[in-house]
Amino acid sequence: MAEKEHYVRTKPHVNIGTIGHVDHGKTTLTAAITTVLAKKGLAQAEDYSQIDAAPEEKERGITINTAHVEYETEKRHYAHMDAPGHADYIKNMITGAAQMDGAILVVAATDGPMPQTREHILLARQVGVNSIVVFLNKCDLVDDPELIDLVEMEVRDLLSEYGYPGDDVPVVRGSALKALEGDEEAQKKIEELMDVVDEYIPTPERETDKPFLMPVEDVFTITGRGTVASGRIDRGTVKVGDSVEIVGLVEKVLTSVVTGLEMFHKTLDLGEAGDNVGVLLRGVDRDQIVRGQVLAAPGSIKTHKTFKGQVYILSKDEGGRHTPFFSDYRPQFYFHTTDITGEIELPEGTEMVMPGDNTEFSVTLIKPAAIEVGTKFTIREGGRTVGAGQVTEIDD
């Protein structure tokens, strides 16, 4: 195997992503950011088709898979995730949104906030994305500046509605396509956006002192070397030689030793919270580990089947259910990176839960999940998100 380039950590690292309604220009903006930063030698310019390249979407022209792009500003190193915009593929938004320290919300000035704008803001809030910066795109297509003011007000109100500081959120107006085409004014706006991202989205306090935990997103085999699990480190640190446990979905916990570590296809000495890494595991067969399990410091997390959760159930207008549900309702609970069916039991005195309600209830899962108090989840049925919440109590 060829010797890999070594990843050197010099600037603080931040995970961000683009969110917003389909066709509002998320991927075009991602391409524009890399193109503008490439002129300063801080990125490799990625064109739209490179970022948009996921096999399933070719026939349909909708972003399905999550693209990771890396670039730098003068101050920081960024991993940028392009979140899918289409409601059918909200599942990737959920695995993706969990990977963001902050987000750039893209809203087309020609349209204003649309249903998925709202859904992405809600999901960002529920999966703990605490800082959002707004890019009003396609401003070159709106003649009347008062109309753009109106769209900006609507976006600020919407952010406030979901608990973001709508009045203080920075809003940058521009045109991603114009910037991509080389328009100087438009490129200045992209620079302004990145300055705002540098300043407004705080460098995350990495949870490096907590025990290591990494939800497994993907598993593959390197011939002659063994099995690799990849994902974003949730907390703690990991290095070659560490013992780890593979926890979740089955009762039995498997123990292994880390024999290799990579980030951005470069070898890494130490992986820390927030890093997207590949972990090479000793003595683990490809079929002994699956997406949805976690790698964890030995003894730090256990599997559970029953818990209480504080949950927000989406209203009909947010794309949620149209009808209430009762005890014994059996949707899917999306933990870390996988769906597990669970049966809901409503608390005494609550006969039913209406779309739009905030509530707490008990859940019994059909498979054990690696969860603890504070673990976030979404509730899904038939491929759509109907609720989101977090674990408030473990009951088994």
UniProtKB/Swiss-Prot annotation:
The keyword Protein biosynthesis applies. Residues 20-27 are annotated as: G1. Residues 137-140 are annotated as: G4. It comes from Lactobacillus delbrueckii subsp. bulgaricus (strain ATCC 11842 / DSM 20081 / BCRC 10696 / JCM 1002 / NBRC 13953 / NCIMB 11778 / NCTC 12712 / WDCM 00102 / Lb 14). Keywords: Cytoplasm, Elongation factor, GTP-binding, Hydrolase, Magnesium, Metal-binding, Nucleotide-binding, Protein biosynthesis. Mg(2+) binds at T27. Residues 61-65 are annotated as: G2. It comes from the Bacteria. Residues 11-205 form the tr-type G domain. The gene is tuf. Disulfide bonds: none annotated. This is Elongation factor Tu. SUPFAM superfamilies: EF-Tu/eEF-1alpha/eIF2-gamma C-terminal domain, P-loop containing nucleoside triphosphate hydrolases, Translation proteins. GTP hydrolase that promotes the GTP-dependent binding of aminoacyl-tRNA to the A-site of ribosomes during protein biosynthesis. Residues 82-85 are annotated as: G3. Its EC number is 3.6.5.3.
